[in-house]
Each structure stands twice: as structure tokens, then as C-alpha cells.
A protein has these predicted regions:
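DNA-contacting interfaces and partner/effector-binding or oligomerization modules
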Residues: 109, 113-202
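N-terminal low-complexity or simple alpha-helical regulatory segments
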Residues: 1-121
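Extended mid-to-C-terminal alpha-helical interaction segments
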Residues: 171-333
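Short, contiguous, pocket-lining structural segments
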Residues: 18, 43, 132, 136, ...
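Internal, well-ordered alpha-helical segments in soluble enzyme and binding-protein domains
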Residues: 93, 140-143, 212, 234
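Hydrophobic alpha-helical core bundles mediating ligand binding, dimerization, or RNAP-core interactions
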Residues: 52, 94, 141-144, 220
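Short hinge/gating elements
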Residues: 78-84, 126-130, 202, 224
Length: 333
């Protein structure tokens, strides 16, 4: 399973507290506490995703994700920032950032789409539950923007995007986005896109240093190797991913996209492990149902809805097949 620095989670906790939210109940639910988080340790990517999804369900301010970017400082990116700043041009810095994007705090995937006059830095977001999706997209877009602006300030530059696309419907708070990013923002697109002028990409960076660049590249390569720490099967990773969702679970195609593979490859590899996507979806629903029955007082019909059943009768039938007992009998044991 992929791991990464726990600093991103710590920054999120600090930001949520300063913005008037209370992240501690969700941390406790996951066996964590801000007082005991060690900034030198690492966290499993899937576990961190689950924490963000749980936070999103309890947020009071719909603009929290947008505001979170300001809590991510350059120092938290370690040698990656110096690797980017020692590139020869802005274009090379973008390409290098894309190559080493696993050293950032992103869950989505970055790529660069060249154009005749404008090019786009594209963030393809990871599929997540509805509330978590906007929370994470806003945080990742604003965090990327903050990182680039901070680097520019260090180098004495002041370049801005020509426009920004966001991958969800226009919210009531849309005006806050144009004010935050200082450019037109278009909603309802498939991916997030920063539109950049090509002449800006050819700009020579005043901090270019090939010798230092080689040193920082070696350090970043070592960090990438440290991320792969365990040998969890694909089935285990898919099951963990499905555990993030309530009400509407993602399709096999959506899950495959989250793991950067085709649906066909996903199904084939699961089959080689003796599992199927359908079985894993049932396992995820069963695990969530057990947890809700034992740890909450939610009515049966509400639990049925949370695990994707429109009618409680269908849920009761499925649960009896899984557990050999009805939900009520299981809860009373």
C-alpha cells in the first residue's frame, strides 16, 4: 500500500481548527489524535482518504476546501520545491512537478495539455463521495495554486492563470472562487484546469542551478521509493477504497480510474486473485452495515440507504444472506 508523509494530514487538522471546524471526532474514530501525530511518520494513502471523506460529512462551511490551500507552506514539500525552483524554465518545472507529483499532497493526477496559445495544467480528480469530492478538489486546486504563488514570490515573479475550470456544478458561492484565484472560473467541467499562457511557460527561472537540481532529484527519487512499503493485494486496496462511500458506490470503471488502470485490467487482476468487483462491493456493504448496526442507533431503513439500498426489505434480505441473521437480530446479539 502506498504511504506518504503525514504532514498533509497535520496541515489539514490545523487548518480545519483555525477555520472553526472540529476535526478531532473523526480523528478519534480512526484511532488518532492531533496531540499524538508525529510529523516525521507516514500514513497509508487509503487511510488518509477515508479520514478526508469522513471530515467532509461534518463540515459547516462549504468553502472550507477552498480556504485550506493557505495552510500548506512551501517547507512542507521538502526537497521537491527546491527541485522545481532549480529547473531552467517554467515549462520544465511543470513537467518535473508532474513526474514527482506523488511527493505532493494530491490524490488526483496532474498532467500538462499543450495548446497553440494556452496550455492547461490538468488535475484529474479521484472519484470520491459527493461532499468529499468538492472538499478535496477545492483543497487540491487551492493548494496547488498556493504552492505556485509562493514559489513565484520567492523568485520575484507574478504570473497568473488566464482561467480555471472546476469539475462540479456551479455552487452558490461561485464568486468566492474568482476572488480567490484572480481569474475567471468556469464550473461544470470534467476536470480541473489551470489555463496558462505559453509565453509564460518559456520563462527562464532566475533560480536555475543544474548542480543543485541533480542533488535534489536524487533526494526526490529516494522519497518516491520510500512510499511503497507494503504488499497489499489489489482486492484489499479496492475494498479499502469502497469503504469510503455512503449511499452511492462507484462503478468498477470509476474504481479502475482511481487506481490508474482500465476496467478490464481491474477485473482481470481481481479474477487472478480469486475475487470479483461484485464480491468486493458486497463485502464493503456488509462491513459498513455491521459497523452501523453495532456502533450507531440509526434505524434499519437509514442504514439500508447508507449502503446503497433504496428499500430496507432488499437490505434485510441481503444482510440475512451475509450474516445468517436479520439486521435487528445481529444488532441485539
Amino acid at each position: 500500500m502506498t504511504t506518504r508523509s503525514i504532514l498533509g494530514l497535520i496541515y489539514m487538522v490545523q487548518g480545519l481548527k483555525q477555520l472553526g471546524e472540529d476535526p478531532e471526532p473523526v480523528l478519534r474514530q480512526h484511532g488518532l489524535s492531533m496531540d499524538t501525530l508525529d510529523p516525521t511518520t507516514r500514513i497509508e494513502r487509503a487511510r488518509e482518504m477515508r479520514i478526508y471523506a469522513d471530515w467532509a460529512e461534518h463540515l459547516h462551511d462549504p468553502l472550507v476546501g477552498l480556504k485550506m490551500g493557505s495552510f500548506f507552506g512551501l517547507a512542507g514539500y521538502g526537497p521537491l520545491v527546491m527541485l522545481l525552483m532549480t529547473c531552467s524554465t517554467a515549462y520544465e518545472a511543470l513537467q518535473t512537478g508532474i513526474r514527482y507529483q506523488r511527493l505532493t499532497y494530491l490524490f488526483g493526477t496532474l498532467r500538462l495539455e499543450p495548446g497553440e496559445r494556452l496550455s492547461a495544467l490538468v488535475l484529474d480528480p479521484m472519484v470520491m463521495p459527493h461532499k468529499a469530492f468538492r472538499f478535496r478538489v477545492d483543497g487540491e486546486v487551492s493548494g496547488t495554486y498556493k504552492m505556485v504563488r509562493d514559489m513565484q514570490a520567492t523568485m520575484g515573479l507574478n504570473l497568473r492563470a488566464e482561467g480555471l475550470d472546476m469539475p462540479y456544478p456551479r455552487p452558490p458561492e461561485a464568486a468566492a472562487y474568482e476572488e480567490h484565484f484572480g481569474c475567471p472560473v468556469r464550473f461544470g467541467e470534467h476536470e480541473a484546469r489551470f489555463w496558462l499562457r505559453n509565453e509564460h511557460l518559456q520563462l527562464k527561472l532566475p533560480t536555475f542551478d543544474p548542480n543543485a537540481h541533480a542533488m535534489y532529484r536524487t533526494m526526490c527519487d529516494q522519497q518516491l521509493k520510500a512510499q511503497e512499503t507494503t504488499n497489499d493485494t489489489l482486492a484489499e486496496r479496492v475494498l479499502t477504497h469502497l469503504g469510503m462511500f455512503n449511499n452511492h458506490f462507484p462503478s468498477a470503471e470509476d474504481v479502475a480510474k482511481s487506481f490508474d488502470m482500465s476496467e478490464r485490467s481491474l477485473r482481470r487482476q481481481l479474477s487472478e486473485d480469486g475475487r470479483s468487483f461484485r464480491d468486493l462491493l458486497a463485502d464493503a456493504r456488509y462491513a459498513k452495515a455491521r459497523y452501523l448496526l453495532k456502533n450507531t442507533a440509526l434505524p434499519i431503513e437509514d442504514i439500508a440507504a447508507q449502503i446503497g439500498y433504496a428499500e430496507s426489505a432488499a437490505f434485510i434480505h441481503a444482510f440475512r444472506r451475509w450474516a445468517g441473521a436479520t439486521p435487528r437480530e445481529f444488532r441485539e446479539r
